[in-house]
Structure formats: C-alpha cells, structure tokens
Amino acid sequence: MAPGNNSQLRDNVSRTKASSPIGRLIFVGLRAADVFWQYNLLYRGWGIQLVEKLGGRAVQSYQVLNPLNITTGLQSYYGLVTLLSIGSSLKQIVHIIWVSEQAMDVGSGFTIALFNTIFNTINALLSLWALTSPAASGLDSKSLLATLSSPVVSVGLAAYTIGLLAEATSEFQRKAFKQDPNNKGKPYGGGLFSLATNINYGAYTTWRGAYALMCGGIIWGATTFGFFFYDFATRGVPVLHEYMSQRVSIARQSLVFMIANHKFD
C-alpha cells in the first residue's frame, strides 16, 4: 500500500527496512530459475510449440538453433535474447542481495519475480513469432556482427545496456551515500541522481523497452516503454514524492521539537 492516506496510490516497494530472508530467497531463486526457463523456451523448442498452440506461425527451428555454437547452441540473435534475460535477472539478484534494505515478504518475492518472468516470456515468444521476430524479417543471425548490423538489434542492445548499467550504478551510488552515518535522513542527489531525480526509474523503463524492442520490434518496444513510463509517471513517482514529503514533514516536526526543548544547548 502507498504511504499516506491517498488510497489511489499503490506502492509496490516496502519502505520498511527488514532482512526478510525467506522472501528474498524466493525472489532470488525464481529470478535465477527464469534464466533457465527463458533459455529452454528457445533451445528446446518450447517457445515455438507454444506460439503454434496459440495459433501463430513461428520461425523455423533452424533460425533459432545453431549446432556449431558450442556455447549456447543458438543462433547469435537468440543468444542475445538469452543474454537479455540473464542481465535482467543478474541485476535484480545483485540489487536484492547487496543494495536493497527494504522488507520483502513471501508474497512480494513471488509476485515481483513472476511479473518479470511473464514479461520476459512474452518477449521470448514474440522473438519466435514470425509476425514480430527480427529473425523472420531477413535478419542474418549466423554471426554476431551480422546480427548487430540490424538497427533494431543494435539500438535495442545499446539502450538495454545503458539502461541496465545506469539503474544499477545509481542504486549503488545511493547505497554508498546512505551507509555514511553523517548522511542519515538526508536525500541523495549526487552521482547519476544529479541528472534526474528519478534516474533509476527512467533507466529501468529504458532497458525494459529496449528488451521488448529487440524481441518484438518497434511497436512492442514502444508499447512496453509506454506502459512502464505511464506506471511510473502516474503511480511510482507520486508515491515516492508523497513518501519523501512525509519524511520531510517528520524531520521538520522533530527539529521544531528539539528547538522548543533546547536540544541544541
């Protein structure tokens, strides 16, 4: 629930600090399992079968698999699609273990992980659907350089990398600031946060949109970007601003109390 009395706002992140080992363990386990799920959707043909069961026409298996690739067994484009899922899981696992101090109950750990898996699965299926897959539109996936010659792939991969690194870096910078006892209760506005108040939100939206762009093309990429942008603009950012306003109000009241009672003497 969101902080405050505004029932229209919903906070997806707990603002209470707690270790929450079980919830975190569930989240980490499911995010790690997602990597294997996404890979097997491609490598074992589960994704192609699912697309066809849903009534779609999938790409041919030879466009997905590459027996000569001893690393993944996939064509270079689908190797990149797998890499996107690895990057998203790794970033979120690192965040929950080394950065986040917020409580994560069992329900949140399961729900947030499931949400990410659903989105990643949709991306994987769209990368296999002949109507949306870059592999079905003449993409040369026999080599990495040839794959990167596609504007959709190169732009998507660049935006994904920048967004993921920006989100992770900004969160580590804020974590380092908060760990200094002298900064207790102070808002952080340095590092990447000096560029934008909600740089981590924008970075997340960027890499999510880029992930979708690489898998499902421009329309799906724009739709995904728009979905997350709208969510953050109408829910995430207002919730955060309300939370920060409450903290400022509490700090102001404490200061007034200290002055009134001569706590600075």
Language-model regions, residue ranges each:
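Intramembrane catalytic core of multi-pass membrane enzymes that act on lipidic substrates
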Residues: G47-K142, V155-T161
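Hydrophobic transmembrane alpha-helices
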Residues: A2-L50, R57, P67, S141-Q173, ...
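Membrane-interface elements of multi-pass transporters and channels
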Residues: I97, E101-D105, F177-P181, R247
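Membrane-water interface of transmembrane alpha-helices
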Residues: L90-V99, A166-K178
